[in-house]
């Protein structure tokens, strides 16, 4: 870290029922399943949201982080379907450098975009990103809502600087989107227990991956993320599939401490 039943009609949620920042409607969801029911979404459209740590302790991995991010985008820029990219970089604060840009229009990240410094306000960054994307989906026509929504979260340390969102608030938001809307969250971390920290904010343990805090570990991390994104775009969810993370798991088992 840095410093120190199937709904046939729309159902309005009350503030007490809705996680912070997600006051809207639920449309045709099955409460007994943890993925989105078949509906008139925009097929082959993926909402891809990056929430990337750029706190001070990430400085030695600046080039590797930039390279990993650019490699993921290069792989998913072409092929079937469309990808909309949103990117938040966070330290003490969260900065959005891409706002739902078609992947083909996203320029490669450089050190001008990614400058590591400061503390780790992960809750604020993730809460802000979820609220932004959920708000857009809430007011979109049903047929314009992306078929898949994927969050890729990276960090190398413990939360230590958030003021706007608590871990409990973020947990409610994450679980709401996972269970009601079929969103996928990937939590990729070094220097902390990825599973413990992911579960603390509602992310499923099988979507949490540990990596070594070096160039090879960072490459494994982004390779895993790219495979997961490809699997989600191809088969709709990651339930029961851990193949995307096997290489990263082996590396951490062999070299991690």
Predicted feature residues:
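Acidic, low-complexity intrinsically disordered regions
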Residues: 15, 20-257
